[in-house]
């Protein structure tokens, strides 16, 4: 069963002052607990499967080079019979039941994906902080680190930063902070949301989220 829920945020500027005139209200379609958890789990599983390369491969006895000649005659030597030196029992032989390239995916339609994302966003509503903009001019990790400290974020915990796009200065300023994940609003996913202990979102990103996932 789906119910409508509302969340509203008042953004902060770069000096930490609230901007009441730029507050944003989002209407979310949220699933009730059991159904919501099930759909979120399915979407996370779909996302994880989509990240797999699926290129791991081993050779069977028929694919390993050589081994065409019978090592020794069938009878009379006292040794165990052998038909090929590329048997899986031999060193340098093929692999039994080894991995082969495959494509693993889980289909979930767009409506279900958006519903899972909206439900998780609502569940995480208390850890979301909105800022008017993340205008990082200098490519300095220390500058972004100090910005987060001023806002009261603990960088020993996972921080998810959502912007409308991953600008180069912002990307370079956050990449050395191991607990900070930068993502654009259009690439937002349930796995990143679930792992986050705190979420920092810009006003433009919140507008994109409203347009892309809550339309």
From Swiss-Prot:
InterPro entries: Ribosomal_uL4 (IPR002136), Ribosomal_uL4-like (IPR013005), Ribosomal_uL4_dom_sf (IPR023574). GO terms for biological process: translation. It comes from the Eukaryota. SUPFAM superfamilies: Ribosomal protein L4 (SSF52166). Keywords: Chloroplast, Plastid, Ribonucleoprotein, Ribosomal protein, RNA-binding, rRNA-binding. Pfam families: Ribosomal_L4 (PF00573). Residues 67-78 have a biased composition (Basic residues). It is found in: Plastid, Chloroplast. The keyword RNA-binding applies. One of its GO terms (cellular component) is chloroplast. PANTHER family: 50S RIBOSOMAL PROTEIN L4 (PTHR10746), LARGE RIBOSOMAL SUBUNIT PROTEIN UL4C (PTHR10746:SF17). Belongs to the universal ribosomal protein uL4 family. Part of the 50S ribosomal subunit. This is Large ribosomal subunit protein uL4c. The lineage of its organism: Eukaryota, Sar, Stramenopiles, Ochrophyta, Bacillariophyta.
